[in-house]
Amino acid sequence: MQTDALIEGMNALGYKVANLSLRELSHGYDVFVERQKKARFEFVSANVVWQDSGEPIVAPTTVVKATLRDGARSKTVRLGFIGLTRNDPAFLKEGPKGRRIVTVDPLSAAEKQLPALRQKADVIVALVALDLQQARQLPKRVKDIGLILGADSTPGRTAMMTRTDDFPEDTEFGRAHLLYAGDQGKVLGEIRLVFDAKGAASSNQRSIIQLTREWPDDPKLAEVMETVKVAINQYNKEQTLAMSPFAAPTPPPAEATYTGSDRCALCHEQAFTVWAKSSHAHAFQTLLSAHQEYNPKCLPCHTIGFGQRGGYLNPQATSNLINVGCEACHGPSSRHPEQIEAGFGRIDVSSCVTCHTRENSPDYVPAEYIPKVIHWKEAQTKR
């Protein structure tokens, strides 16, 4: 559902090229082919290949012509694109007639494909689904790449973890400029090419714009996204309700587990009172209002311990772990009353940016937000 909505949105925005990463093949080759038919843009990849021949399963490169205008003058520029994704030795997908799809080394694939692309393009752009370290190696191995546009494809990285500020916004290696996309489509990158009198690309001007609430949504695209978000939430709800209504087994006694904020209030009464008046104590209501209470991408920052052993499961089984309670920041506390330790649960403001990322919380300013949730001073005064 989400992929179909993304394709619809990319069509509406006039995308011309997209890099084929392993995620597009997660549901199998046949599903990808059907989605490819819906796309009004081209998928490229030089290192997702047929195992028997070593040939890419889609075009490895493509050229897009763009007309640049400066007053009465105009120039047609040929932009050459190559797609590269991380090499996963364990990746293996079945294709038609028993053929299999694998990945090969992206740097070697680039070396193989770029000589031909150089003959057809004025500027070469590499679209990469690589971690930053690999992306840095690309311009060292392959010359004449003018721009590298990247998105992180590290296994296990969630939407919450893949943040724009994980990477340099504008890092230059040799002649190539390396820029990484943010998460959730909330960052707009603008690149302006500058050509000299001979018509050659001499430099480029780059800017990254955070799409905060100051930028209104496109009504049509907002409707598409709202529809798919509600549909995904409903699907997740049905899957969750089909599971056992009972909570997961309690971890062994040797391990601390989550208990819920009410238990903390027995000793930390004043701190609990301050917390109860904060927006953290009502964080789950935000999901309910947006029909996203079953969205696994949202739950880690609106509940206690979602995805962790003994953490939040669903409203029926773990109602005590709803909202951003004490243990969401300070950790599981079941053993704390009996084994009080100095420094238990101690955190600092750096912990806040786990959830208050630029994508999820664009208005977050520590100096303004922290005073709204301060409760540790009151608790200390009581002692």
Give the positions of each predicted feature.
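A contiguous, mid-protein "functional segment" used to position or interact
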Residues: R346-N360
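Alpha-helical scaffold elements within enzyme catalytic domains, especially in hydrolases
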Residues: G9-A12, A116, L266, V274, ...
